A protein has these predicted regions:
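Conserved small-domain helix->loop->beta segment predominantly found in fold-type I
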Residues: 73-141, 158-164
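Structural motif
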Residues: 3-5, 23, 52, 111-114, ...
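Short, glycine-/Ser/Thr-/acidic-enriched flexible segments
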Residues: 29-31, 95, 118-120, 152, ...
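Positively charged, small/polar-rich N-terminal and surface patches that mediate targeting and assembly
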Residues: 44, 87, 141-142, 148-150
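Solvent-exposed alpha-helices and their adjacent loops that cap or buttress functional pockets
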Residues: 13-17, 44-47, 105-107, 139, ...
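PLP-dependent enzyme catalytic core of the Aspartate aminotransferase-like
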Residues: 64, 129, 145-181
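Conserved PLP-enzyme active-site core in the AAT-like
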Residues: 1-84, 89
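Short, well-ordered beta-strand elements within core beta-sheets of diverse protein domains
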Residues: 53-63, 110-118, 174-178
Length: 181
């Protein structure tokens, strides 16, 4: 099991990317020995307004999640069948190596779909720049569809050879599927 659970409240719990926040859950020992010293410098709580926004947003959480998960599975299936897509990484697909495990552990498979395209880095950027509904971002905290290129954003400080070993090629994209029709 997990000793610590970290939640971002920015995307799913907030629902609109209006707040920044999170929650850290752990044993009393972890909270006192590890987290408390950090909190003394940063403060342990978000603002009352952000807390209220998140609380209100939780009222629509089940509806939003149903839509996000359904859209993500549809997009993953579409990408998997497209000839310009090299591979799709999404646990909701039967082709995913851990699909059976994911079915046992999850009631839904999330809305983050990673995929690789055939082509050069320039081709990948051209693809991203031609998207009409999806916004390019390095922050995936919203209910609209957002895409990022990990090799030049989140993992840009890792040498290319190491990134490739980690499975983060120049053609890998991460798509946070939103609630659009």
């Amino acid at each position: 099991g997990a000793d610590v659970v970290v939640y971002s409240t920015t995307k799913h719990m907030d629902g609109q990317g209006r707040t920044l926040g999170g929650a850290v859950l752990g044993s009393e020992e972890f909270i006192k020995e590890t987290l408390l010293p950090f909190h003394r410098h940063t403060g342990p709580a978000m603002s009352p307004f952000n807390a209220w926004v998140i609380l209100k947003s939780l009222e629509t959480f089940p509806l939003r999640m149903e839509r996000l998960l359904g859209n993500a599975l549809s997009v993953a299936k579409l990408l998997e069948s497209h000839p310009k897509v090299k591979r799709v990484i999404y646990p909701g697909l039967e082709s995913h190596p851990q699909h059976e495990l994911a079915k046992k552990q999850m009631s839904g498979f999330g809305n983050l779909v990673a995929f690789e395209l055939h082509g050069s880095k320039q081709d990948i950027f051209k693809f991203m720049n031609n998207l009409k509904i999806v916004d390019i971002s390095n922050n995936l905290g919203d209910v609209k569809s957002l895409i990022t290129h990990p090799a030049t954003t989140t993992h840009s400080n890792i040498e290319e050879e190491e990134r490739i070993k980690l499975g983060i090629s120049n053609s890998l994209l991460r798509l946070s599927v939103g609630m659009e029709d």
